[in-house]
Swiss-Prot record:
Chain residue ranges for the region called Disordered: 1-30
Bilayer-spanning residue ranges: 58-78, 88-107, 117-137, 145-165, 171-191, 196-216, 248-268
Protein name, entry field: Uncharacterized protein US12
Family the entry assigns: Belongs to the cytomegalovirus US12 family.
Compartments, as annotated in UniProt: Host membrane
Alphabetical list of InterPro entries matching this protein: Bax_inhibitor_1-related (IPR006214)
Pfam family of the protein (one): Bax1-I
């Protein structure tokens, strides 16, 4: 007798599928934590300090070359006597350093390294522009401008160091800088000056204030420099050009209020006549 067996639970002719193979769970990814030892931290601090010494040494060399050339121009007995040229030459001399500062900032944004030849070109062009100030004004005015601009640069550098050192002091300094410009504007507004004098001084103070903020930012960039940049010579020269141009433009802006008694009275009537001719033609 033939026995016929029926498979319960499955239709006839259907092949039973095998379950997919189950792979074992993969272990979690291993996180590699770079542990910086005390010796490595000390080595990086020393490397950063030496890099900053070289940086500010380069800036001091550029500034010394500019000051020495300006003193030589001041010793020349000849002076610019044409009123218009004497009073406007410092303004035209400011345009070239501002253009060079923009180019140095562009190099900083593009992460392009600076070269020794570029530093020499920057120093030469800027020195020629600044030295013309010595042919336009008295020695006392130039010396006062150098002293005052140097004090402002040292003050901005000190604020940047304090901001990098302590978080609470950083917030206090930011609050101080926020209220400083309105206070200076209020001081200018209450003075018994002519309207054009107030406008020019307010614009000059605004430019100096903005340049102080830029100088603080550049100094903080130097203090918070990442070790991944390897402290190369190209980065050093590029940063030195930025700091040098900040100091030069600060000096040129400080010249404006110091020379106010010379050129404010001369051009007050001319500005008034020009405005009257433009608006009442």
């Amino acid at each position: 007798m033939v026995q016929i067996q029926f498979h319960q639970g499955e239709p006839l002719g259907h092949k039973k599928e095998k379950p997919p193979p189950v792979s074992p769970p993969s272990p979690p990814p291993i996180r590699r934590v770079t542990v910086i030892t005390k010796d490595e931290d000390t080595l990086r601090s020393v490397q950063h300090f030496l890099w900053m010494v070289r940086l500010y040494g380069t800036v001091v060399f550029q500034t010394s070359a500019t000051i020495a050339t300006t003193i030589l121009f001041m010793l020349i007995p000849w002076r610019v006597t044409t009123p218009y040229l004497r009073d406007t030459l410092p303004f035209w001399s400011t345009l070239l350093p501002c253009a060079l500062r923009c180019h140095a900032y562009w190099l900083e944004r593009q992460r392009r390294p600076g070269t020794l030849m570029l530093v020499m070109v920057y120093t030469t062009l800027t020195t020629i522009s600044v030295s013309t100030i010595g042919l336009c004004f008295d020695r006392t005015v130039v010396i006062q401008a150098y002293v005052l601009s140097s004090m402002l640069c040292v003050w901005c550098t000190g604020l940047a160091w304090l901001m990098a050192w302590n978080m609470q002091r950083r917030l206090a300094i930011l609050c101080l800088l926020s209220f400083m410009l309105p206070i200076l504007w209020l001081f200018i507004a209450v003075q018994s000056w002519e309207p054009y004098q107030r406008i020019i001084l307010a614009l000059t103070v605004s430019f100096i204030y903005g340049l102080k903020i830029v100088l603080i930012r550049d100094t903080l960039t130097v203090l918070y420099r990442s070790p991944s940049n390897c402290y190369t010579d190209g980065d050093l020269l590029r940063t030195a050009m930025l700091l040098y141009m900040d100091q030069v433009i600060m000096f040129l802006l400080v010249v404006v209020p110091l020379t106010a008694p010379i050129w404010y009275p001369n051009y007050a009537g001319a500005l008034g006549r020009t405005a009257h001719w433009l608006f009442h033609k």
